[in-house]
Regions:
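Carbohydrate-active catalytic/glycan-binding domains of CAZyme proteins
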Residues: 1-207
């Protein structure tokens, strides 16, 4: 939500429906999060490819767009313009050549954290995370989190609920044709001064 324009701004991965070559960003806006969004077109940030992506908004209103670029080889971090309708600058090219996708970001008690997955199509893989003292600061090397399939999921987004960090992951139906069998998993994240741990639970209740 952009307080200056009073608009909800959506950024999304755009493809043309015929092939997977556009690797672009689409932008849409609406007065409410559940209304009819107005499409404002698509583009490639500074000419770069953009696929799996996420947004992060600071408390002061500064917003960032993070996406898989260069055929998923790198994760790019862009600071957005004040109205969230364009990129203002390219802040980072993270973990170049590591082929990370599905980025998800959260601010914890000690650090900012980013969880991502390797590129294995619909098959789950070992999730990894990194930390930094600020979005625009120096990010750590990648460290493993969860088990070898991230408990059969791929990072979707991270939540801070009353000070508790939660991982929300996509559990894909597989091969694209079984999308109706896909679902979500939610796991608590334990933050320490030494890092981040994903806690597996069969069921969980949150207040």
């Amino acid at each position: 939500y952009n307080k200056k324009t009073n608009k909800f701004v959506m950024w999304a991965h755009f493809e043309n429906g015929k092939n997977y070559l556009d690797a672009a960003v689409a932008i849409a806006t609406c007065d409410t999060p559940d209304g009819d969004f107005t499409y404002h077109g698509h583009f490639n940030p500074y000419g770069y490819m953009s696929r799996d992506c996420t947004l992060y908004q600071e408390e002061d209103g500064t917003a960032y767009f993070i996406s898989a670029s260069r055929d998923n080889a790198d994760l790019h971090v862009y600071r957005l313009s004040d109205d969230y309708m364009n990129v203002d600058c390219l802040v980072h090219r993270l973990w170049q050549g590591e082929y990370r996708e599905a980025p998800a970001v959260i601010k914890g008690k000690y650090h900012y954290y980013m969880i991502s997955s390797f590129c294995t199509g619909w098959a789950p893989n070992q999730g990894k995370y990194a930390w930094a003292d600020s979005i625009e600061g120096r990010w750590s090397s990648l460290k493993e989190i969860g088990d070898e399939t991230t408990y059969d999921s791929q990072s979707a987004f991270l939540l801070n609920v009353n000070g508790k960090l939660l991982y929300v992951g996509d559990r894909w139906g597989g091969d694209g044709d079984k999308y109706f069998e896909s679902g979500y998993v939610v796991y608590p994240l334990k933050e320490t001064e030494d890092g981040l741990e994903m806690i597996y639970q069969d069921t969980a209740e949150f207040e």
